[in-house]
Amino acid sequence: MKTLVICSGGLDSVSLAHKVAAEHDLIGLISFDYGQRHRKELDFAARAATRLGVPHDLIDMRQIGAHLSGSALTDDVDVPDGHYAEDTMKITVVPNRNAIMLAIAFGIAAAKQADAVATAVHGGDHFIYPDCRPGFTQAFEAMQAQALDGYASVRLYTPFVHEPKSAIVTEGERHNTPFADTWSCYKGGEVHCGRCGTCVERREAFHLAGVADPTPYADPEFWRAAVEGR
């Protein structure tokens, strides 16, 4: 299955890229710059492509991202601390982000005669992000079947959509994903903050998977209180 992987440079998507490279025919990685404050993640995506020996396409969506206002990921709004399961994390939603990225990725995949677009949405995303839920991914794939009817047949590959993040860590370890060479933190500092939702979820996932976490955190113990306080 010739597959184009949407890769942010984070733990989930880099692990997915390594899984696809091992199990399918990885034809490239595609990343999106939508003006996110943690833009440094894109450097990790580029390194993953180099490591896996495939092209890396970086799509400039900054002009579009400027209009998707109100999110802590793109605007001058503080990224909240705590676990993803808290309502405060809804401020990190970028409206319709995945739908826009997937539409572009499907067009590129069709042009490249790929069989699939892969994205690393997972079960832990469902509470906060509606465009990571199975209902969305199924509907989007059905829509693309109509959009590309008679031109191309491209499926949406979402192997983690019903899985917790800890399962991604387990799968990533199985495929020798270099976890230290991934970036998750939404604050985009020198090291992972250890306090934002994605840092807490990352740290918890390694703990639940029983895999050593190689990530340096500015606050390495905050996650415990955040998880206990859910």
From Swiss-Prot:
**So what EC number does this one have?**
6.3.4.20
Cofactor(s), names only, from the UniProt record: Zn(2+)
UniProt entry tagged with the keyword Zinc: yes
Q: Which Pfam families match?
A: QueC
Q: Sorted alphabetically, which InterPro entries does this protein's record hold?
A: QueC, Rossmann-like_a/b/a_fold
Q: Name one GO molecular function term.
A: ATP binding
Keywords from the UniProt entry: ATP-binding, Ligase, Metal-binding, Nucleotide-binding, Queuosine biosynthesis, Zinc
Q: Which CDD domains match?
A: QueC-like
Cofactor binding remark = Binds 1 zinc ion per subunit.
Per the record, the pathway is: Purine metabolism; 7-cyano-7-deazaguanine biosynthesis
State where ATP binds: 7-17
- Residues engaged in binding Zn(2+): 185, 193, 196, 199
A Gene Ontology annotation in the biological process aspect, one of them, is: queuosine biosynthetic process
Reaction(s) catalysed by this chain, per the record, are: 7-carboxy-7-deazaguanine + NH4(+) + ATP = 7-cyano-7-deazaguanine + ADP + phosphate + H2O + H(+)
Instruction: Family membership, please give it.
Output: Belongs to the QueC family.
Provide the function of this protein: Catalyzes the ATP-dependent conversion of 7-carboxy-7-deazaguanine (CDG) to 7-cyano-7-deazaguanine (preQ(0)).
Question: What name has this protein been given in UniProt?
Answer: 7-cyano-7-deazaguanine synthase
> What is the species listed in this Swiss-Prot or TrEMBL entry?
Ruegeria pomeroyi (strain ATCC 700808 / DSM 15171 / DSS-3)
Chain's gene name: queC
